[in-house]
Amino acid sequence: MFNRSNEVDEPIRVEGKTMGTTYHITYFDKKGRNFKNSIDSLLIVVNKSINNYDPTSEVSRFNTNTTGIKFDLPYLYAPLKKAQEVFHASDGAFDPTVMPLVNAWGFGPGKQIQPDSSKIDSILSFVGYDKVRITTDSLVKKDSRVQLDFGGIGQGYGADVVADWLRSKGITDLLVELGGEGIAIGKNLKNNVPWQVGILDPNSTYENQFFKAYVSLTNKSFTTSGNYFNYREIDGKKYSHTIDPETGFPAQHAILSASVFAADCVTADVWATAFMVMGHEKAIELLKQHPELDALLMFSSTDGKMQTYMTRGIEPFVKLEP
């Protein structure tokens, strides 16, 4: 006799746009609830805290204010504290105060020109996450010129907020992907296997995207930072969008991409950015000191061939394409 209780319901898929990118969410719910409207409403509020491209957001108000801001929403304090933690742990490689440098190099909304070194030196005098003070209800500038770029933290934090909200609704098996990063909880019940996430090949172009690796994940967050499509060409030379806050110039390393796996997505997000800034050699050394992190790094060897490095914790779950 056919037993209906052994069947698994079809997953519910929700997708949309947020933070200048797209999101895709898959989850299983015996009640068959579609949470798209609630998720969109939640992301609108999160954007009102952390979206640099919304001139009315809290982070934008901080950037245009000379002294700082009081928090109106509950979504800015947590990523600010995480940024502070990784700023110190990475020796300043992750630093959200690079915003004026991002704009100077034309990665913001302005014109693409190469700034001269004197302008860079001038901007560097007010770059540094130690130039802000975070309290439970406010963010204060120690220098009126300080500005924050949440590009290396916002999407990961947004994915965490959505995943936490879904879990609060009793969802135990879900995959949240926001702008290529996200969190995998439980299993893909349709096939009773871990969730599978693809990692882009660094040779991908915007028009032709293909995967270099597939990773099987359960109860783990993931993010990949790379300069796949995001670079500027000035006078025939390509510059990566990853700014080194120590030099003020785009980071020049052999690293092609950094995929990081952690307990939460905001942690994975900030460390992936930090690894792109510091390069694969320093990243490998730092990973030895941080057993809570796993990573898959792709980089160019001296002969121009692509190499990979994986931490032991993630290696059994990675399938590399030839």
What do these predicted regions represent?
Residues 1-322:
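Mature catalytic core of soluble alpha/beta enzymes
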